[in-house]
UniProtKB/Swiss-Prot annotation:
Protein name as annotated: Tryptophan 5-hydroxylase 2
NCBIfam families the record matches: Trp_5_monoox
Pfam families referenced in this protein's UniProt entry, alphabetically: Biopterin_H
Catalytic activity: (6R)-L-erythro-5,6,7,8-tetrahydrobiopterin + L-tryptophan + O2 = 5-hydroxy-L-tryptophan + (4aS,6R)-4a-hydroxy-L-erythro-5,6,7,8-tetrahydrobiopterin
Pathway: Aromatic compound metabolism; serotonin biosynthesis; serotonin from L-tryptophan: step 1/2
Subunit structure: Interacts with DNAJC12.
Keyword terms: Iron, Metal-binding, Monooxygenase, Oxidoreductase, Phosphoprotein, Serotonin biosynthesis
Family: Belongs to the biopterin-dependent aromatic amino acid hydroxylase family.
Length: 490
């Protein structure tokens, strides 16, 4: 069963005050060296290679302006300018004036050309020796949009998942000729209703409650009853832990189809995941992008009642019975999110590999517990026949290795030719982390849980922001450990 997936302009500063002619000899010499470096930057080198032309360097450097404040003392300026030389930042223009803030200080204006990385590193060093007064934004390469123009689009904030959710490849009302409900006009109209509900939903809204028909509830009941018999001996312990909680808090019963809004609120409290309605199949890229935000796209329609134990597509029985119980587990939730994060901005080829790994883990994965094979994949936990088959001697079971698993063919209408087993979710997560390192991407990403947005880690400044958050968390942990030690008398 196929899962439903599958950021200078150089604004001239008001230049007033005295010139740099008052600089000490050492400063004159340093300025001369900097000017010489700039003049020689376009000449041929010793090997006869031509310097880059203006057009060639336009995409590698931009004009930048910085104003910093120094104490009016001998040697202060030379120390600051030496940093420009060390970072190979070419100065185009430099001026000074008495500080408007403090009479004992001098403000230095520098108009220069450099690359983004060099400039960011320069600023970090200048902060230790000077006071940064102002920075002008850079030209050319410094716009984030231009940097990412060759990277496939991905949502940068959770509300942009609306765009992903509405890019449905195949609507739930468009049934194939071999679909059990193809000739049932009443069923087709019902499916259209669920499509309209999903397409009208936007982030932040409560999920519309559905009044399921008697036949839909009956179909749900058959699936619920038959699968419940197998779970004690076939499902992993994490599943068995959360299933009773869903019965208690979300109305998981044979005679009741749970509402997505109740399920979403439950998951939010347990693991930070939420669900949102979707009208049908999404591309692997759009579906995995949701996981990056801990959002699971979930169908609301129910399979045709003529064959309750079969569905050619993921329906709400598959989502609620297969996926939701494990999405309530924090470790499994993190494993799911990391697959999603790895997909953001990745190539089509890499996304397909990630989607295949998703298929054979989160959809059809097995794990070992107490020496026995147990199922954690939603495709298994929502399919009576394949759940029995996967844990039988007839099934081909292999150790999960993303490098080989991503090459396995995904089968939709028949049982899988192979299933992949992990010792634990933690082991599977670590293997996926190693595999994600092979994905070609000019940056890393970080999910900010406070703003529910994706931060692009591409320079020292962006990484510094994340480190600040981690340092705060680490301080909390250290404080807790110290209090424990005091309590225990250690």
């Amino acid at each position: 069963m196929q899962p439903a997936m599958m950021m200078f302009s150089s604004k001239y500063w008001a230049r007033r005050g005295f010139s740099l002619d008052s600089a000490v000899p050492e400063e004159h010499q340093l300025l001369g060296n900097l000017t010489l470096n700039k003049a020689n930057s376009g000449k041929n080198d010793d090997k006869g290679n031509k310097g880059s032309s203006k057009n060639e360097t336009a995409t590698e450097s931009g004009k930048t302006a910085v104003v910093f404040s120094l104490k009016n003392e001998v040697g202060g300026l030379v120390k600051a300018l030496r940093l420009f030389q060390e970072k190979r930042v070419h100065m185009v223009h430099i001026e000074s004036r008495k500080s408007r803030r403090r009479s004992s200080e001098v403000e230095i204006f520098v108009d220069c050309e450099c690359g983004k990385t060099e400039f960011n590193e320069l600023i970090q060093l200048l902060k230790f020796q000077t006071t940064i007064v102002t920075l002008n934004p850079p030209e050319n390469i410094w716009t984030e949009e231009e940097e990412l123009e060759d990277v496939p689009w991905f949502p940068r904030k959770i509300s942009e998942l609306d765009k992903c959710s509405h890019r449905v490849l195949m609507y739930g009302s468009e049934l194939d000729a071999d679909h059990p409900g193809f000739k049932d006009n009443v069923y087709r109209q019902r499916r259209k209703y669920f499509v309209d509900v999903a397409m009208g939903y936007k982030y932040g809204q409560p999920i519309p409650r559905v009044e399921y028909t008697e036949e839909e509830t009956k179909t749900w009941g058959v699936v619920f009853r038959e699968l419940s018999k197998l779970y004690p001996t076939h499902a992993c312990r994490e599943y068995l832990k959360n299933f009773p909680l869903l019965t208690k808090y979300c109305g998981y019963r044979e005679d009741n189809v749970p509402q997505l809004e109740d399920v979403s609120m439950f998951l939010k409290e347990r693991s930070g995941f939420t669900v949102r309605p979707v009208a049908g199949y999404l591309s692997p890229r759009d579906f995995l992008a949701g996981l990056a935000y801990r959002v699971f796209h979930c169908t609301q329609y129910i399979r045709h009642g003529s064959d309750p134990l079969y569905t050619p597509e993921p329906d709400t029985c598959h989502e609620l019975l297969g996926h939701v119980p494990l999405l309530a587990d924090p470790k499994f939730a993190q494993f799911s999110q990391e697959i999603g994060l790895a997909s953001l901005g990745a190539s089509d080829e890499d996304v397909q590999k990630l989607a295949t790994c998703y298929f054979f883990t989160i959809e059809f994965g097995l794990c070992k517990q107490e020496g026995q094979l147990r199922a954690y994949g939603a495709g298994l936990l929502s399919s009576i026949g394949e759940l029995k088959h996967a844990l039988s001697d007839k099934a081909c079971v292999k150790a999960f290795d993303p490098k080989t698993t991503c090459l396995q063919e995904c089968l939709i209408t028949t049982f899988q030719e192979a299933y992949f087993v992990s010792e634990s979710f933690e082991e599977a997560k670590e293997k996926m982390r190693d595999f994600a390192k092979s994905i070609t991407r000019p940056f890393s990403v970080y999910f900010n849980p406070y703003t529910q947005s994706i931060e692009i880690l591409k320079d020292t400044r962006s990484i510094e922001n994340v480190v600040q958050d981690l340092r705060s968390d680490l301080n909390t942990v250290c404080d807790a450990l110290n209090k424990m030690n005091q309590y225990l008398g250690i």
